[in-house]
Amino acid sequence: MAEFVRAQIFGTTFEITSRYSDLQPVGMGAFGLVCSAKDQLTSQNVAIKKIMKPFSTPVLAKRTYRELKLLKHLKHENVISLSDIFISPLEDIYFVTELLGTDLHRLLTSRPLEKQFIQYFLYQIMRGLKYVHSAGVVHRDLKPSNILVNENCDLKICDFGLARIQDPQMTGYVSTRYYRAPEIMLTWQKYDVEVDIWSAGCIFAEMLEGKPLFPGKDHVNQFSIITELLGTPPDDVINTIASENTLRFVKSLPMRERQPLKNKFKNADPTAIDLLERMLVFDPKKRITATEALAHEYLAPYHDPTDEPTAELKFDWSFNDADLPVDTWKIMMYSEILDYHNVEAASVGEMENQQQYLAQ
């Protein structure tokens, strides 16, 4: 039977197995608290994320299940990987992943990035997105704080599956807004992998400039700032707007011409400007893909078609439209965790009694 150790972090109880020691707070996200720790089994430093109240509502249970499924499925050098998962006696869920020293947000706020680092970071972001998109997954919330970096400049994308389309009035998503694709703001309907390319373009611009490209105060201001640089959206984009209020707002904006990005990024390499122009396109269908971006001249120093893999299998989203009670999500979650630990549960009852095993 596994032994659990309790610690108070930011007023939150961390209840972990004795396999992990030296807990230190790393950051607080919207849905969980992250600590660094030492894995006694491997002698590696790891990140442990406690999911807050995973079974308190069906929405939270589903979100946790989605993140678990995605972490299990996505296996790529530029995507964060799961090294352990367990459920504590208090029924909190803990994800254990590799620990990277910092994130792109911290790097960008501490010093300007040199050209070769910008190039290498963007290459790794696009390499990761090529894989993720080939698995049929859209990140939806790509931003500098979701891009982890270690001392060797290895980069990994994290926080998959948590971000959903949020209520425009919802607070606490200010930083997310800066990187949000216009089709999400304009239509709030079906969107696809192109939203991640837009976000990556905003991050690329921020690496070049040292500050956010579109720092909107709210969604209205955000969209207005975008049009100041990229001009008025074309008619085929405007025609996709379903909301009359949104349509009225867009049509009320003054007609604007797209500004050449070379005028804004005066010190950037012309090939960097060309790639950025192809990423920041209003019409998602005309936006460059991750695969195409990897083959762009700007990323030529790192591009290797033989070492930019795609996913072997598409991610199974069949659960995503399910409207299930908490207890059902809990059983499904236990099943996934047991599968991760290569344990077969003979029955649902046995699944629910496996918590002590799962923590070992």
From Swiss-Prot:
Modified positions (Phosphothreonine) in chain numbering: 171
PTM note: Dually phosphorylated on Thr-171 and Tyr-173, which activates the enzyme.
Localization per record: Cytoplasm; Nucleus
Cited SUPFAM superfamilies: Protein kinase-like (PK-like) (SSF56112)
Gene3D superfamilies according to UniProt: Phosphorylase Kinase, domain 1, Transferase(Phosphotransferase) domain 1
Gene Ontology biological process terms from the UniProt entry: stress-activated MAPK cascade
Record-annotated active site: 141
Phosphotyrosine: residues bearing it: 173
Top-level taxon: Eukaryota
One of the record's GO molecular function terms: MAP kinase activity
Family that this chain belongs to: Belongs to the protein kinase superfamily. Ser/Thr protein kinase family. MAP kinase subfamily. HOG1 sub-subfamily.
Record text about domains: The TXY motif contains the threonine and tyrosine residues whose phosphorylation activates the MAP kinases.
Protein name per the record: Mitogen-activated protein kinase HOG1
